From Swiss-Prot:
<feature type="binding site">
    <location>
        <position position="301"/>
    </location>
    <ligand>
        <name>[4Fe-4S] cluster</name>
    </ligand>
</feature>
<protein>
    <recommendedName>
        <fullName>4-hydroxy-3-methylbut-2-en-1-yl diphosphate synthase (flavodoxin)</fullName>
        <ecNumber>1.17.7.3</ecNumber>
    </recommendedName>
</protein>
<dbReference type="Pfam" id="PF04551">
    <property type="entry name" value="GcpE"/>
</dbReference>
<comment type="similarity">
    <text>Belongs to the IspG family.</text>
</comment>
<keyword id="KW-0408">Iron</keyword>
<feature type="binding site">
    <location>
        <position position="298"/>
    </location>
    <ligand>
        <name>[4Fe-4S] cluster</name>
    </ligand>
</feature>
<keyword id="KW-0414">Isoprene biosynthesis</keyword>
<dbReference type="InterPro" id="IPR004588">
    <property type="entry name" value="IspG_bac-typ"/>
</dbReference>
<dbReference type="InterPro" id="IPR045854">
    <property type="entry name" value="NO2/SO3_Rdtase_4Fe4S_sf"/>
</dbReference>
<comment type="pathway">
    <text>Isoprenoid biosynthesis; isopentenyl diphosphate biosynthesis via DXP pathway; isopentenyl diphosphate from 1-deoxy-D-xylulose 5-phosphate: step 5/6.</text>
</comment>
<comment type="function">
    <text>Converts 2C-methyl-D-erythritol 2,4-cyclodiphosphate (ME-2,4cPP) into 1-hydroxy-2-methyl-2-(E)-butenyl 4-diphosphate.</text>
</comment>
<keyword id="KW-0479">Metal-binding</keyword>
<dbReference type="GO" id="GO:0141197">
    <property type="term" value="F:4-hydroxy-3-methylbut-2-enyl-diphosphate synthase activity (flavodoxin)"/>
</dbReference>
<dbReference type="InterPro" id="IPR016425">
    <property type="entry name" value="IspG_bac"/>
</dbReference>
<feature type="binding site">
    <location>
        <position position="351"/>
    </location>
    <ligand>
        <name>[4Fe-4S] cluster</name>
    </ligand>
</feature>
<dbReference type="InterPro" id="IPR011005">
    <property type="entry name" value="Dihydropteroate_synth-like_sf"/>
</dbReference>
<feature type="binding site">
    <location>
        <position position="344"/>
    </location>
    <ligand>
        <name>[4Fe-4S] cluster</name>
    </ligand>
</feature>
Length: 409
């Protein structure tokens, strides 16, 4: 695993999930269903949890949504899905939590946006009201600052202060400073109201990679609250994945961050679970967590004119991901297994020997056989039309004999 030294933050418990302190970085996701449709929201929440999301955030934006929250929690419990629910509030959270105590109780954490919790004279009053409710129900709070909804009064104030500096900050520096100031001042206000410091999580989300890195570096140096990382509005497909990975990996490598979310825009009709898989793969690729066996595969070249190795790599990845829930219940350590599916003799045997299990498929003009290596030793050579199924059986047998069986409770 990684030698990254995590920066010390205050430990916080969200439902049954510990974040901060000495806890590993936790994966979070968010539903995109209408929360008032409690069944659809419960089903998508369960889907995200099955994919590996350890915390799930849901929008609570109306009386109907607030009334649905306890039903969602109840339905999840009946499905044996104990993932903690986070309520995402904007504008009217103070009223919804007051008028719907069952919602306030069913949620494991509240998200408050200091930029729109209230305006003018009502801002501090409504912020304090939400914090008091968090204290009443013993819930942690994420103070989530977002550049798109930054507190305009605060922004005007810090801009005025900046104009009087001997060396004023430029526009980018001002934006970063305002984001951090909003988060820290809001946290201080929450503590003044009575919320314990270990009940506070901070986030400052922007859509620029460099801005996100600079903001969180500053934030982590100025306070030790638990931090939630995420690049807001990362985008679709490879752009969203690359942008989120570029931002989060730098911060995680520096030991910054206690929870992460990859905010991908899904394809129409696409699975919301993709954001969970990407978050897990970021953490596992960096050696910070282990969730499922990693499959190494070569990119292919002129020596690999057959597409079979590509098809097999995808099939093996799908196989181990599908088997992992069962393996997780039965065995300790299977998530650390490494696999290699290689396409020719150049790097195939070498990469295969370095994995726990590897297969080197024949390239163009090579003998039609595929040697299999287990822990560096060649164990069998596969031939014929059933290589995929035989290789998956080898993986299954390896798991059964290699990893310690868990005792039944």
């Amino acid at each position: 695993m990684s030698t990254v030294i995590k920066r010390p933050t205050r430990a916080c418990v969200i439902g049954h999930v510990k974040i901060g302190g000495d806890a590993p970085v936790v994966v979070q996701s968010m539903t995109n269903t209408d929360t008032a449709d409690y069944l659809a929201t419960a089903l998508q929440t369960a889907e995200l949890a099955r994919a590996g999301s350890e915390l799930v955030r849901i929008t609570v934006n109306s009386p109907e949504a607030a009334a649905a929250v306890p039903k969602i929690r109840e339905h999840l419990d009946r499905m044996n899905c104990n993932v903690p629910l986070i309520g995402d509030f904007h504008y009217n959270g103070h009223r919804l939590l007051t008028e719907h105590p069952a919602c306030a109780e069913a949620l494991a954490k509240y998200r408050i946006n200091p930029g729109n919790v209230g305006f003018g004279k009502k801002k501090d009053e409504q912020f304090a009201q939400m914090v008091e409710l968090a204290c009443k129900y013993d819930k942690p709070v994420r103070i989530g600052v977002n550049w798109g909804s930054l507190d305009q009064e605060l922004l005007a104030r810090v801009m005025d202060e900046n104009s009087r500096r001997a060396e004023p900050l430029d526009a980018t520096e001002m934006m970063r400073h305002a984001m951090v100031t909003s988060a820290l001042e809001s946290a201080a206000k929450a503590e003044e109201v009575g919320l314990a410091s270990e009940k506070i999580i901070l986030s400052c989300k922007v859509s620029s990679v460099q801005d996100l890195i600079a903001i969180y570096r500053d934030l982590s140096q100025r306070a030790n609250y638990a931090l939630h990382l995420g690049l807001t509005e990362a985008g679709m497909g490879s752009k969203g994945i690359v942008a989120s990975t570029a931002a989060l990996s730098v911060l995680l490598q520096e030991g910054i961050g206690d929870t992460i979310r990859v905010s991908l825009t899904p394809e129409p009709g696409g699975s919301r679970s993709q954001e969970v898989i990407v978050a897990q793969e970021i953490l596992q690729t960096m050696g910070l967590r282990a969730f499922t066996p990693m499959v190494a595969a070569c990119p292919g070249c002129g020596r690999t004119t057959s597409t079979f190795f590509q098809e097999l790599a995808g099939e093996v990845q799908d196989f181990v991901r599908a088997k992992m829930p069962e393996w997780k219940l039965r065995y300790d350590g299977a998530e650390n297994m490494t696999l290699a599916v290689m396409g020719c003799i150049v790097n195939g045997p070498g990469e295969s020997k370095h994995a726990n299990i590897g297969i080197s498929l024949p390239g163009t003009g090579e003998a039609p056989s595929a040697p299999v290596y287990e822990d560096g030793e060649k164990t069998v050579t596969l031939k014929g039309d059933n290589i995929a199924n035989e290789f998956k059986q080898i993986i299954e047998r390896y798991v059964e004999r290699t990893y310690t069986k868990k005792l039944k409770s």
